[in-house]
Structures are given as structure tokens and as C-alpha cells.
């Protein structure tokens, strides 16, 4: 227990099958964040971004996995809430290359007073990181941000495409909880 994937209401807005050479077949970016863990018997909970203002939303989360490859934040305030959670000891894994065409949709992150190429740049800047941090693990306050520069769809679509993802998730979980992840083929 303690693994969650961040979802936003905008998740279903990005359902165009192929645009400018970018595709996310069969909801793969979402499944890429959940199925690799579930196949190892790890229950994964969903956290709705729009529920972040409620204090209890992240109370039991040890590792929060997110990507803007398949959704976008509707409001900038959610980023400060995520950063505050990390600074207080939370562990956030961000997966993505930030290259899908929806990054350029006219929205708050690329309108005045901002000029970000993707909403993740705003998140990382609030965390005190470079706007486009390289893949790696970063200490932010008492917590950690792990950046995986790969779209999560590849964790579901490619054979062994989830190896690095699972290594990062399980390693970060052990680091923040002090517990080893128990892998199994069931949820009991």
C-alpha cells in the first residue's frame, strides 16, 4: 500500500489517436503507470488532481506517480500543493518526455504571465529544479522527485519497457518508507 497514480479530469481530453506523429494507443500512457506494478501484485490507487486541496488526499501516499503525457493540470495551484507535499517528505515520480502536441494547447502555462513549453516546467521550477531536469533523483525539502524522461506508454507497449520504471518506483518506495516492496502475483 502507498502507491498512487495522479489523474486529472483532463485525462479524457487527450483521446485523439494520432496527431503530428504522436500517438497514445489504447490509453497506454495511463496503463504504463499502473499495469507494471499491478502485474507484480502491487495495488495502485488513483489520486485525482482536483482533490489535492483536500488534506487527506495524499495522507496515505508514499510514492505518487504522474505524467503530463496523457493529461494536463487545469489549474496552476495544484503544482504548489504537490511541491509542498514533496517538501514535507513525499516522493513524486514524474514520467514523460513532454513532447505530445497537447503541451502547446493555449493554456495557463503558456499564457501571460507564464511562458512555459509544458506544464511540468512550472512544477519543476516551483520545486527549485531546472525547468527541464535530466532523468534522475532530486532531493526537494524532506522529499524526493524522481524524473524518468520516457513517456509511460512505452512501459506498457515495449517488451521490458517498464524495467527502469519499476526499478525507480521500488527503490524510491524503499528509500522513503524503509520497507522493501513485496512482489507477488496476487493482491491478497
Residue map of PLM features:
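An acidic- and aromatic-residue-enriched active-site/binding cleft used to recognize and process polar
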Residues: 8, 49, 68-69, 97-99
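Aromatic-Pro/Gly-enriched surface loop or interdomain linker
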Residues: 1-61, 141
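Generic, well-ordered alpha-helical scaffold segments in large soluble proteins
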Residues: 36, 40, 67, 85-88
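Carbohydrate-binding surface patches
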Residues: 2-22, 26-31, 67, 72, ...
Amino acid at each position: 500500500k502507498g502507491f498512487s497514480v495522479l489523474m486529472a479530469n483532463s485525462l479524457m481530453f487527450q483521446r485523439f489517436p494520432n496527431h503530428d506523429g504522436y500517438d497514445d494507443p489504447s490509453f497506454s500512457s495511463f496503463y504504463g503507470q499502473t499495469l507494471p506494478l499491478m502485474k507484480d501484485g502491487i495495488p495502485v490507487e488513483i489520486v485525482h488532481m482536483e482533490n489535492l486541496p483536500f488534506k487527506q488526499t495524499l495522507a496515505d501516499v508514499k510514492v505518487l506517480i504522474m505524467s503530463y503525457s496523457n493529461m494536463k493540470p487545469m489549474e496552476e495551484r495544484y503544482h504548489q500543493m504537490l511541491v509542498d507535499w514533496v517538501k514535507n517528505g513525499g516522493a513524486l515520480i514524474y514520467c514523460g518526455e513532454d513532447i505530445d502536441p497537447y503541451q502547446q494547447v493555449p493554456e495557463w502555462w503558456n499564457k501571460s504571465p507564464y511562458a512555459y513549453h509544458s506544464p511540468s516546467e512550472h512544477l519543476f521550477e516551483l520545486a527549485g529544479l531546472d525547468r527541464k531536469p535530466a532523468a534522475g533523483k532530486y532531493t526537494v525539502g524532506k522529499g524526493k522527485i524522481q524524473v524518468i524522461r520516457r513517456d509511460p506508454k512505452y512501459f506498457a507497449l515495449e517488451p521490458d519497457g517498464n524495467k527502469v520504471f519499476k526499478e525507480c518506483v521500488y527503490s524510491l518506495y524503499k528509500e522513503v518508507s524503509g520497507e522493501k516492496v513485496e512482489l507477488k502475483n496476487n493482491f491478497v
